[in-house]
Amino acid sequence: MIYKNNDFKFFKEFKVNVDSKKNNEEVIIKLPEYFDHFYDENIKRIKEYIFCKKIDYRILGFKSSVNTKENFCKMLEEIEIYIKEIYKKYKKVYVVGISKGGIINCLLYNKLMKNSNIKFINISTPYKGTIFADPEAVKKRLEERKIPFRRSIYNTYFKIYDGNFPDQMIQQNSDILKEVKYNSKIINFVAKATFSSFLKDLFSLNVESAFLYLIDKALRIKGDGIVSIDSQTRNYKKDIKIKATHKMSYIIAIKKIVIL
């Protein structure tokens, strides 16, 4: 497994499995979901996106400069140019948006849709936002539900909350979400944390994912532990429903699309 990373002005690229000697014909481009420092500090998390040696992977992370709507829009332009260069090198390109990355995918789609070798996939996308992008909303829900140790839970949540523009973007009723136009040709996965997925996570010692199931039930998210089903849903007939938490939705969804 080969790790390389390249810096752009508004995002950072982590190349995985990219080897000129292999000449892989397919590539997965994962749009920004986290800031680059998250991946720098958690190389293990990058490995979780890899499931096939015959595919190249390019994981993108926000740069800290994406702190305003203006810079967010500049990042979109930069990613558009980047993807147009990438698809020249591969027979098939999967542009994947997980969580807030799905919003980015919607904003990029109209500019890239003419390229027939690109497949657009959204997973666990908060089209209507999520309370976890708003500390006050989380605090209010904890109080309403009278969750035990709610102060400790809130303090832990607040430590990992970035609060930068990408988080503000997916707050419920944000201006950006109102501007997003969804196209039904984007493959949309809706994830629901179920008891069976919880048991599977427990047996595989996936504590983080199992915890999301408990959070989903305790806070009545009614979704994947982070995003409600209502917020993820775009097209009732075409949406693909999967049993998974927010953390596990990518690997389950992408294996249904990529033909190995």
Where are these predicted regions, by residue range?
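Short coil-to-helix leader/linker segments, especially the first N-terminal amphipathic alpha-helix
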Residues: M1-V16
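Short coil/turn segments at beta-strand junctions that form active-site/ligand-binding loops
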Residues: E25-E26, K89-V93, S116-I118, S184
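Structural recognition of the beta-strand scaffold that forms the well-ordered cores
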Residues: K30, I59, V95, I121-N122, ...
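The conserved beta1-alpha1 loop
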Residues: L31-E33, I98-S99, S124, D224
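Gly/Ala-rich beta-loop-alpha elbow adjacent to hydrolase catalytic centers
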Residues: V96-G101, N105
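Helical cap/lid subdomain of alpha/beta-hydrolase-fold lipid enzymes
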Residues: N110-L260
